[in-house]
């Protein structure tokens, strides 16, 4: 397990270098969606991507070539880290990438720091949350996913809501309460259009 972690940390240096070498347009225009379970990342990614390139990180069929290596890892978080690094460092064109809830959150401080470095060059990392109030977000997601309070899924999602990782990675936070997935997608598009206009004026 220790060797496996060291292997991932070593691989992350190559991921970071390969991401640095990606065309600037890919890093500037791609959209990464992060957030707890039940925030609609996949649905919103499909709307944003339209007919463009969408990469769903928790879709085992879509990424079956990468998921085929899952059994080689004793620690699933090391596999998730490697999956994220591989996908981000090999992007061929502007994409909409929806992370699974755990892909952006790591209890291991070294992996967490390396994830920050891997994501640092991407301009549009959108954290989706129901509400700015963490407890309200928890209650909304419990009802939305029909999850029992205190269950393992609830505990996992509470960790995803409260852990600092997502807040540190995000370039923007979108609160979804009272909005449809289409509303959220349009808000993201408007946000990025305005951001692009401001950058052009500089």
Where are these regions (language model features)?
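NTP-dependent small-molecule kinase module
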Residues: 2-26, 47, 51, 124, ...
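A glycine- and Lys/Arg-enriched "phosphate-lid" helix/loop adjacent to the NTP-binding pocket
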Residues: 119-168, 172
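P-loop (Walker A) phosphate-binding loop of NTP-binding proteins
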Residues: 36
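Glycine-rich phosphate-binding loop used to anchor ATP phosphates in small-molecule kinases
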Residues: 77-120
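Hydrophobic anchor at the beta1->P-loop junction of P-loop NTPases
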Residues: 33
């Amino acid at each position: 397990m220790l060797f496996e972690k060291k292997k991932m940390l070593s691989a992350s240096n190559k991921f970071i270098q390969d991401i640095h070498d990606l065309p600037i347009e890919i890093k500037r225009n791609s959209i990464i969606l992060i957030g707890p379970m039940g925030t609609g990342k996949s649905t919103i990614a499909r709307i944003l991507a339209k007919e463009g390139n969408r990469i769903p990180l928790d879709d085992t069929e879509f990424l079956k070539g990468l998921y085929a290596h899952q059994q080689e890892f004793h620690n699933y978080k090391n596999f998730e880290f490697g999956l994220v690094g591989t996908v981000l460092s090999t992007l061929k064109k502007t994409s909409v990438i929806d992370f699974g809830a755990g892909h952006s959150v790591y209890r291991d401080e070294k992996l967490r720091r390396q994830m920050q470095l891997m994501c640092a060059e991407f301009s549009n990392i959108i954290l989706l949350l129901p509400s700015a109030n963490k407890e309200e977000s928890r209650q909304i997601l419990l009802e939305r996913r029909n999850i029992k309070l205190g269950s393992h899924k609830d505990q996992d999602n509470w960790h995803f809501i409260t852990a600092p990782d997502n807040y540190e990675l995000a370039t923007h936070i979108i609160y979804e309460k009272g909005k449809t997935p289409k509303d959220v997608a349009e808000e993201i598009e408007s946000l990025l259009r305005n951001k692009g206009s401001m950058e052009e004026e500089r």
